[in-house]
Regions:
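A structural signal for short hydrophobic/aromatic patches embedded in well-ordered alpha helices
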Residues: 39, 70, 109-110
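Conserved short "hinge" loops at termini or chain/domain junctions
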Residues: 1-67, 122-148
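Amphipathic alpha-helical coiled-coil segments
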Residues: 108-125
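Short, solvent-exposed secondary-structure capping/transition elements
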Residues: 52, 79-92
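Short, hydrophobic/amphipathic alpha-helical patches that form generic packing surfaces
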Residues: 45, 68-84
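Short, intrinsically disordered/low-complexity patches at protein termini
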Residues: 94-95, 126
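Eukaryote-specific, cytoplasm-facing alpha-helical/coiled-coil scaffolding segments in long proteins
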Residues: 96-108
């Protein structure tokens, strides 16, 4: 890209600790590269579609100062994807020792985490776009740097 430096798959995996050795439940990565790339596009698309419309970004032009928000929102989308999968496949399994277990019951925790982080991103996007719109209409205060 040569611009601000987009998120990388490695950064997302590191935030999630999504490595085969770390996922003791199944010994494999949880998210494919394609799922991660798709999840990376969703926060930017949401930001661009948030009113007031006008300023838009892509993976290359997303401001570096907002990188952590993009990363958190990407993780939220991956957690939502996983929550839907776990919810769809949830079932109780009786083990030989008589213990009922279902690793897919984690969907509730994934869903809750995802919704909280995504809602925070949505509120931030709305406030940031409003500030950008205000600055675009009235300029900046005390210098040449925008207030966002």
């Amino acid at each position: 890209c040569g611009c601000n430096g987009p998120l990388t798959i490695s950064q997302v995996r590191m935030k999630l600790r999504d490595y085969a050795g770390e996922n003791d439940a199944w010994g494999a990565i949880e998210f494919s590269d394609a799922e991660i790339v798709n999840a990376m596009t969703l926060p930017i698309n949401h930001f661009n579609g948030t009113t007031p419309l006008g300023v838009t970004f892509d993976a290359c032009t997303w401001p570096q100062i907002w990188q952590s928000r993009w990363l958190d929102a990407t993780v939220a989308q991956l957690m939502l994807t996983a929550a839907y999968n776990y919810m769809r496949n949830a079932r109780n399994i009786q083990t030989a020792g008589g213990v009922t277990e279902d690793r897919n019951q984690r969907w509730k925790a994934y869903m809750s985490l995802s919704q909280g982080v995504w809602q925070e991103f949505q509120l931030w996007a709305k406030a940031t776009k409003a500030t950008m719109n205000w600055n675009g209409g009235f300029g900046t205060l005390g210098g040449t740097s925008p207030l966002y």
